A protein has these predicted regions:
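Short, well-ordered beta-strand elements
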Residues: 1-5, 12-16, 25, 167-169, ...
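Catalytic phosphate/nucleotide-handling subdomain of diverse soluble enzymes
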Residues: 1-46, 190, 196, 227
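In a subset of proteins, long, contiguous C-terminal domains/tails are tracked
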Residues: 301-357
Length: 357
């Protein structure tokens, strides 16, 4: 497995997979209550470790090898239980570290600032000061009311995307690339430059006990990431998705659909998903809904009843809802003649396409 560094949440799915390694998931039944419960608890333990340990490695010493070790995973597996955790459990203990307990501080005292407030503040700070020399009229679109009015009308009618973008590419030589670019709607633009400001600093923490606490020159631990999987030493699968804290959850579920239930790639992507929101959001003010699971509609039946009996609060969503990610994936297979075959899948939860030539 390959993923982004600890300045992202890329390790989260790998840690959860490690915690699940000794569980025969296939025998539990796909998307059964027992399966959803076990995968959810593995994810919640991994998210606790994400928030406890992961951050920009230029500023924080991250115990990567320990977090991915079998010994550490064995200790984390001992936390599995029959009923829902409720609040996010604490991170695991590693000698020499004092990890941040995100579950104990969800929401905390950290305050969010609205996008509109941020834009107003930034525009005020970035607006050029008018001097006699700078007051010379120039064409910037604002001097043409009719053009400006038409632009405003067009923007009012535009459906603005609310999510990260994703792109997965494999060429004829088998080279694999996945990119997950992301800035949110209404990213502030510096007047006169055409350049938008990044706004991922909302994924920093203000709590000084967090490894992801804001600092000059430091990268926030961001949610966008991708996963690449090799099989028998050769590239096999590459995939990513938008979705914030759902990203690791969606990628893990798709991979388990392939590995534990032997689904075809598009089937694995289409299959109903679930989402824990016990995890404090990566976005300020880092709110959480302890013990709450979101389920796509097809899971809202016997599975939901059994999960409720385990102590989960459940929220139903329509099938193929974009709150559950939008995975793009490519698998490299070899046919009987040794020719490389590329199998691509696009998630119906967003405007996602798969194409080849």
């Amino acid at each position: 497995f390959y993923t982004n560094g600890t300045w992202s949440q890329g390790m989260t799915a790998l840690m959860a997979l490690r915690y699940l390694q000794k569980t025969d998931l296939g025998s539990l039944g796909h998307n059964s209550a027992a399966y959803v419960h076990r995968v959810t608890q593995a994810l919640e333990l991994a998210f606790a470790d994400r928030d406890g340990y992961l951050a920009d490695p230029a500023f924080v010493k991250v115990p990567v090898q320990t977090l991915l070790s079998e010994e550490y995973a064995r200790n984390r597996r001992s936390e599995f239980r029959d009923e829902a955790f409720g609040a996010l459990p604490p991170p695991g203990e590693i000698e020499g570290y004092a990890p941040f307990n995100a579950g104990a501080t969800a929401g905390g005292t950290e305050q969010a600032i609205s996008t509109e407030q941020a834009i107003s503040t930034l525009y005020g700070a970035c607006a050029p000061r008018k001097t006699a020399a700078a007051a010379k009229p120039r064409f910037d679109g604002t001097s043409l009311p009719s053009v400006r009015g038409r632009l405003a009308a067009a923007l009012d009618e535009m459906v603005v995307g609310q999510d990260t973008s994703q792109l997965v590419i494999v060429d004829r030589e088998g080279n694999m690339v996945a990119i997950t670019p992301s800035d949110f709607p209404k990213s502030p633009m510096v007047p006169g430059t055409g350049m938008t400001l990044g706004n991922r600093m909302v994924q920093f923490r203000l709590d000084e006990s967090s490894p992801n606490v804001i600092a000059p020159g430091k990268r926030p631990r961001v949610t966008p990431h991708a996963l690449a999987v090799h099989r028998d030493g050769e590239p096999w699968l590459i995939f990513n998705t938008p979705g914030g804290d759902m990203q690791a959850q969606a990628l893990l579920q798709v991979f388990l659909n392939l590995s534990s239930f032997e689904m075809e790639l598009q089937e694995a992507v289409n299959a109903p998903r679930f989402r824990t929101v016990s995890v404090p959001s990566s976005f300020a003010p880092h709110e959480a809904e302890p013990g709450t699971l979101w389920l796509e509609g097809e899971l809202f039946g016997e599975t939901a009843q059994a999960l409720s009996a385990r102590g989960y609060e459940l929220v139903e969503y329509q099938p193929w809802d974009n709150h559950f990610g939008s995975v793009g994936a490519i698998i490299i297979e070899m046919d009987d003649s040794g020719e490389r075959l590329l199998l691509a899948a696009a998630d119906p939860r967003e405007h996602t396409w798969a194409a080849g030539r």
